[in-house]
């Protein structure tokens, strides 16, 4: 085999290993994902209207039969401004000087007030027959900034903060097999702040974050402008349902936040001690204490652990499995995770189920890698050196800044991280003035051999 053939074989092998990781592991098929058909090719039609232009009550807006024929099509996940531009109410902000505040082409919230960008978002959905007799949950993963969540004429939750996800039990408020209505009233940030003129010069001379008042909110600080955004920030401060909303069902108990902590034995790095944790939720189903069993399985490794528990009405309980209690959680000669160009990105899968009286109530899964990361300054100039699984690694890092108007998708995220990997980058700093990224984003890190620093 000549050198060219060997090179092509290696290139295709690497390309295939990266390509094979582009499926969103977090998007389980047992959920209903309420993404819009506009821009996201989802299955749901969303409409939006400025709250001040709606005369009907919230109960009417969120009930079947309400007429939205004069409402605008909405992009969900997305923002108010994304949808307004999509409906050609305002010009494309990224084109020419359209977004310059002096142009007055797109109203800035600091001049027109919060009410101008306060909107209703509305859609209709069906609950499948398979959800009958179960607890039914509505999960908004991110709304900026405050929101009222209405289902079939009932206010079921209020959300405060851009990076808050919510778990809303809608069991008693939806009809299985029939149409239901979800209406979300979305409010902008409490303190929008104002943009400030940017003088040309060194980075330190720019007015990052406008007048600084945007920092009074827990939100995307760069939405008001930063030293890399010449065009004066985002006019609506990215108000909207910016992450997906999903619907799913569980039994009388629910599971959340499965996590695996790995500890490698040194100096051989040939023994791994795994600690598993998960949260159990009792959504006020019973007045009595419920007893059950939590089962954890590291798939394909013949490692299974079980633990009985009792939980009170409305309680959230954390259950932990340690290698001291369960010797099978000590793995000998584990397949280690390595960063790009240092070895394979081996990943394990954990599946956790919770059962009551032998019936499975809920199951969750997550993927994890086994690795050890350390650093020291034992160098002549006291510079920091990093080690992975005891091997010295040279850090090639970069900064990660989100798309300004939050126009993103799984396909775009995958492409951008793939390009980053192909550039030889092995560490990304998630800049604090941006967002809390999507689950899919972090999934790709593990599969591509890239670290992240927050």
Task: Specify the residue positions occupied by each region the protein language model found.
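Accessory beta-strand-rich segments of carbohydrate-active enzymes
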Residues: 23-33, 47-53, 57, 83, ...
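Bacterial Sec-dependent N-terminal signal peptides
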Residues: 1-26
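Beta-strand-rich binding/interaction modules
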Residues: 149-151, 270-312, 317-319
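Surface beta-strand/loop "capping" patches
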Residues: 251-285, 380-385
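Short glycine/proline/serine/threonine-rich loop/turn segments at secondary-structure transition edges
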Residues: 131-134, 174-179, 192-194, 287, ...
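Internal, hydrophobic beta-strand segments that form the core of beta-sheet-rich folds
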Residues: 185, 340-355
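Active-site-adjacent substrate/metal-binding segments within catalytic domains
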Residues: 82-127, 131-139, 145-152, 157-160, ...
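Short acidic/polar inter-strand loop motif in beta-rich domains
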Residues: 187-194, 355-361, 390
